[in-house]
């Protein structure tokens, strides 16, 4: 990999990730690399400025923070095909990041990148758009939204706990009306997030599929569904026209929707690209460690049962 121009985004208002960012920037500049650096957080979005001010194609984005910081980077950088090296500095679980232990010798990391001694993992994303009008003559009313983990459709009210009524179509065919607290439409990457908390299935992150998980449905027959990646999921909010429903992307508010609006969610035409430094990268080891499964209490090797 050539590193002529690099983005470094660090978790906003986190001194540890900022110190790492400054160290990385200094080392890369000493290797004749142009660096664009800035904070990323709920009130800080550096990516439009990064992309607009780049003097040449961006070769890599180094993202220092937790999963939320990495999710933000993926939504902005995936359409441009920019690979992301996420490092868990100041984060929590770190499902999407390299351990900071892999990043201690940063000069060695740069050597590995220059010498192409790494792997690239491509992860499926979802895109959503909102339409209004008659079913046969719908007009778009929003931009395209991207999500790496999931989209969530939930009712919204400042002073009431509202039960939502959501009609769902798959590939133009009405499947069900869900009465409950909302729906989660997830990628395999997102299946270990909000989806698993709502009793949805865990899908291997190397798959391409879409899962739909009802949130606290009032019908016991409302169960999670796993769909082919090429499916189009359409959701119509029904009920009170005075109450809005919110569309969330990776835990961030995308927009408000109302009865007579339709949300179409499908596989995006871009993938999030992640740099993997771990030489023995195991999805199941990640599950054991991050979800604290029984396997984390046993020192396990691949030859243990031989």
Swiss-Prot record:
GO terms for biological process: NAD metabolic process; NADP biosynthetic process. Transmembrane segments: none annotated. It catalyses: NAD(+) + ATP = ADP + NADP(+) + H(+). GO terms for cellular component: cytoplasm. Pfam families: NAD_kinase, NAD_kinase_C. Its EC number is 2.7.1.23. Keywords: ATP-binding, Cytoplasm, Kinase, NAD, NADP, Nucleotide-binding, Transferase. NAD(+) binds at residues 67-68, 149-150, 181, 192-197. The active site is at 67 (proton acceptor). It comes from the Bacteria. GO terms for molecular function: ATP binding; metal ion binding; NAD binding; NAD+ kinase activity. Its cofactor is a divalent metal cation. InterPro entries: ATP-NAD_kinase_N, ATP-NAD_kinase_PpnK-typ_C, NAD/diacylglycerol_kinase_sf, NADK. Belongs to the NAD kinase family. This is NAD kinase 1.
């Amino acid at each position: 990999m050539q590193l002529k121009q690099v983005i470094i985004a660090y978790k906003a208002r986190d001194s540890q990730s900022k110190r790492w960012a400054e160290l990385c920037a200094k080392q890369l500049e000493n290797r004749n690399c142009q660096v664009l650096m800035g904070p990323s957080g709920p009130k800080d979005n550096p990516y439009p400025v990064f992309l607009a001010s780049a003097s040449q194609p961006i070769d890599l984005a180094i993202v220092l923070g937790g999963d939320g910081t990495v999710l933000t980077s993926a939504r902005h950088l995936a359409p441009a095909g920019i690979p992301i090296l996420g490092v868990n500095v100041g984060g929590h679980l770190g499902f999407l990041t390299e351990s900071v232990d892999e990043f201690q010798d940063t000069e060695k990391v740069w050597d590995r990148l220059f010498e192409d001694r790494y792997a690239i993992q491509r992860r499926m994303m979802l895109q959503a758009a909102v339409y209004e009008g008659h079913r046969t003559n719908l007009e778009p009313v929003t931009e395209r939204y991207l999500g790496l983990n999931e989209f969530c459709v939930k009712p919204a009210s400042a002073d009431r706990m509202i039960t939502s009524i959501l009609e769902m179509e798959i590939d133009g065919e009405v499947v069900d009306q869900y009465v409950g607290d909302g729906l989660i439409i997830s990628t395999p990457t997102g299946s270990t997030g909000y989806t698993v908390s709502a009793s949805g299935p865990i899908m291997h992150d190397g798959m391409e599929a879409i899962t739909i998980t009802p949130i606290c449905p009032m019908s016991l027959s409302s169960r999670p569904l796993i769909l082919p990646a090429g499916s189009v999921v359409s959701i119509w909010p029904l009920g009170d026209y005075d109450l809005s429903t919110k569309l969330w992307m990776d835990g961030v508010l995308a927009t408000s929707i109302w009865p007579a609006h339709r949300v179409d969610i499908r596989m995006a035409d871009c993938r999030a690209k992640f740099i993997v430094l771990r030489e023995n990268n195991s999805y199941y080891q990640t599950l054991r460690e991050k979800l604290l499964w029984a396997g984390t209490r046993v020192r396990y090797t691949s030859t243990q049962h031989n």
